[in-house]
Amino acid sequence: MGKRKRTENIQKNYPSEELLIPAVALMIMLLLAWTWTIIVAKTGLSGAAYFFSVFHVILVVMVVLPYTLKSVIAIAVRKRAEQNQFRNAKCILNAGILISIIYSIITVSLLYIFSDSLLQSVLINQKSQLTLMILNTVILFYSIACTFMGYFEGLGGSFPLLLASITGHLVMTIATAIFTDLFMKQGEKAANVLRIQGTQYAYGAVGAAIGITAGIVIMCIAILVMYQFYSSYFRRLLKRDTSRRRTDTVDVVTRLIRQVLPIAGSYLMMLLYPVIDQTIFFRTMGSGQDAILMSYQWGAYDGLYGGVMFLPLLIALALASREREKISLAFRSGDYHEVRIKAHGMIRDNIIISLFFMVESALAVRLIRCGCIALILLSLSVLLLILLPAINMSIAALITGICALAANVLTAFLTIKVLSLGVYGAMISVIVFGLVYVLLGIMFLGRAVRGRIDLRKTFYCPFLSAAITGIAMLLLGLLFELFLPPILNVLATLVISFVIYFIALAKLDVISAYSVSRFPFGELLLRFGKMIGIFP
């Protein structure tokens, strides 16, 4: 009886998703930041380059189909659940598992077969091979985990997924710290015996790869355990299915693939630029520099991408994805006011994440200060990547990604090959990618919603407010670091920048006294706005 009550509803007695998802996202972000910091700190910039050059390749394979398939399965299962077609929902799960296994077998086999070609064209050198082989095994576990995550999301069970994600990332952080340290020590011994410079860095990258793999495997196991725990609940759902309609598994597989491909192509365009940039960098610079110096330079760039840019973009993607279905439903039903509210909220979340990480960037070297601009542009690109497919513009998102990637490749070739700017050329290429993506995305978005949504208040003015705030944060950070310690610098810059962002939104008529009163702590914000004279 107790178990029946416990499994009557997956979400029952759990905290609200509005509070739970951001809190868990923050915890995962901190764990990932800690993991990335451990990798860079224990392996050095050269070891980080060995690891991240492989990780970018595996990340493309992991996200393009498994992550996209998760979203498509969640939508399809939710529709069946609303119609009490739980057997068809289970059929979608089975089809997703089949697609995941086939995809994993194909991609893992291809990566094994073409590993030598990757080492000669994309990665640093042969020292990256073992790291590639270890991370390659992650694909199967991540694909299966994503399939079950989509099924849980479709049935409304976010809490088990969040618990499994926290468990997996916690194990990932601990395992990375242990194995990276262990393999670095073994690598130092091997380097002394073999007298081969740089061996310890390759060993450290292998240890980091084992830690990442352990975290993904544990997350997959935790999700399967959660599925087994709620098995009696799922069986009761099947008994409640009164529909006579049955869906053929082959037909479901075909329809899922047809829905996944345009979205997967959009994600592919967003993820390919780090791989292309590192390929151009290694092939261009390899003739004039040794592997250790190249790995050190690329490690500095990858440390920026992994620690300062990748994590906030990942969280921005998670928070923006949360609103995708609501925007899609509101757009189809003609509720453009709801679309505007949700889109504005997504912009706000992305900008807050970008600005928070930009403060850290402003305290570092010139390379990281360039990342301030790139992070804002890429964060808005992630927002458009979610918004365009949500309003049935997947092809526009794909075209936008192709054009942005082409601009990135051209810029990388000119800055790295012709102008010999090295890693600075790679960062300039990222800025160009984000700029082209944002401009084209806004153009397509404007055509889709022209006359139905106030684009000025929904997109243009928030972007302008964010740009004003970003410039102010950079200048404030540079000013305060002259006489304040880093922690006080961050706190002072955040507080003042929030005020600047608030004033900019009010002066550009994005927010009014009435809308502010509906915010969390709205009355306090309204009194503050009246005190500084921006509201009557």
Where are these regions (language model features)?
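N-terminal membrane topogenesis motif
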Residues: 1-34, 87, 91, 243-267, ...
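Helix-loop junctions and terminal segments of transmembrane helices
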Residues: 67-82, 313-335
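Membrane-interface junctions at transmembrane-helix termini in multi-pass inner-membrane proteins
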Residues: 142-164, 373-403
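Transmembrane helical elements of multi-pass membrane transporters/channels
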Residues: 17-33, 37, 212-219, 223-227, ...
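Membrane-interface helix-loop junctions in multi-pass transport and translocation proteins
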Residues: 159, 169-222, 395, 405-439, ...
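Interfacial segments at transmembrane-helix termini and the short loops linking adjacent helices
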Residues: 116-135, 352-376
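Membrane-proximal transmembrane or re-entrant/amphipathic helices at the cytosolic face
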Residues: 2, 477-536
